[in-house]
Amino acid sequence: MTIGIIGAMEEEVELLKNSMPSVEEIVIGGAKFYVGEIAGKEVVLLESGIGKVNAALGTTLMADRFKPEVIINTGSAGGMAEGLAVGDVIISDRLAYGDVDVTEFGYTYGQVPRMPAFYQGDAVLLKKAETIYREYFAASENKAVYGLVVTNDSFIMRPDQHETIRTFFPDVKAVEMEAAAIAQVAYQFDIPFLIIRAISDLANQEATISFDEFIHLAAKQSATCIIELLKTI
């Protein structure tokens, strides 16, 4: 089984890449693929670049060239739900776009025409994650949270951005810039997927400072959770 893992930034894939005993690097269209093993599993690790287009391009290249049987997205996210803290982990059971609006044509806000309004994380992977992380976080000051992640081609920090997202997605747990695009490509290729992100900021007016300070912590937390999950796949 080949497992695809995708992160947008170097910081988000570095720990996973360093976990590979040997690595083959392949660059296609600016997307950096690292082929090797993690936890005894065949892995294709992608540093896609930031944003929905980069994420969709890289995921499509991964699906077409490397034929992964599972895709997992790692990285950071901005917390939107009450009670979330930096270092908490969000496992997404649903994903949506926060900046797509074709409601004039009868679609739900966030829905791309002829695509589902929400992309569902794989039920089997979600169950595995829930079992693993219940034990993993039992003695930790951080926690794992499950729920809706909303993807935007913007870094969310302003009150007006919050208001728009909460208006259409009142149960949103976190926001970021790639996951729904990865989920859409996985959906179109019929590849099971799971999104595991760690909170780097609280998507508020201090978000840029928090992100710069805590991106490495979030990346480490997310990557560690993924390595634990790989042991069970």
From Swiss-Prot:
Q: Which HAMAP family match?
A: Salvage_MtnN
Q: Which Pfam families match?
A: PNP_UDP_1 (PF01048)
Question: What protein family does this chain belong to?
Answer: Belongs to the PNP/UDP phosphorylase family. MtnN subfamily.
CDD domains with a match to the protein in the record: MTAN
| Designated name of the protein | 5'-methylthioadenosine/S-adenosylhomocysteine nucleosidase
Please give the organism. Answer: Listeria monocytogenes serotype 4b (strain CLIP80459)
| GO function terms (MF aspect) | adenosylhomocysteine nucleosidase activity; methylthioadenosine nucleosidase activity
What Enzyme Commission number(s) does the record list for this chain? 3.2.2.9
User: What biological processes does GO assign it?
Assistant: L-methionine salvage from methylthioadenosine; L-methionine salvage from S-adenosylmethionine; nucleoside catabolic process
The function of this protein is: Catalyzes the irreversible cleavage of the glycosidic bond in both 5'-methylthioadenosine (MTA) and S-adenosylhomocysteine (SAH/AdoHcy) to adenine and the corresponding thioribose, 5'-methylthioribose and S-ribosylhomocysteine, respectively. Also cleaves 5'-deoxyadenosine, a toxic by-product of radical S-adenosylmethionine (SAM) enzymes, into 5-deoxyribose and adenine.
User: Which residues are the active-site ones?
Assistant: E12, D201
UniProt KW keywords? Amino-acid biosynthesis, Hydrolase, Methionine biosynthesis
Pathway linked to the protein: Amino-acid biosynthesis; L-methionine biosynthesis via salvage pathway; S-methyl-5-thio-alpha-D-ribose 1-phosphate from S-methyl-5'-thioadenosine (hydrolase route): step 1/2
Q: Sorted alphabetically, which Gene3D superfamilies does this protein's record hold? A: Nucleoside phosphorylase domain
Q: Which reaction does it catalyse?
A: S-adenosyl-L-homocysteine + H2O = S-(5-deoxy-D-ribos-5-yl)-L-homocysteine + adenine; S-methyl-5'-thioadenosine + H2O = 5-(methylsulfanyl)-D-ribose + adenine; 5'-deoxyadenosine + H2O = 5-deoxy-D-ribose + adenine
Q: Where does substrate bind?
A: G78, I156, M177, E178
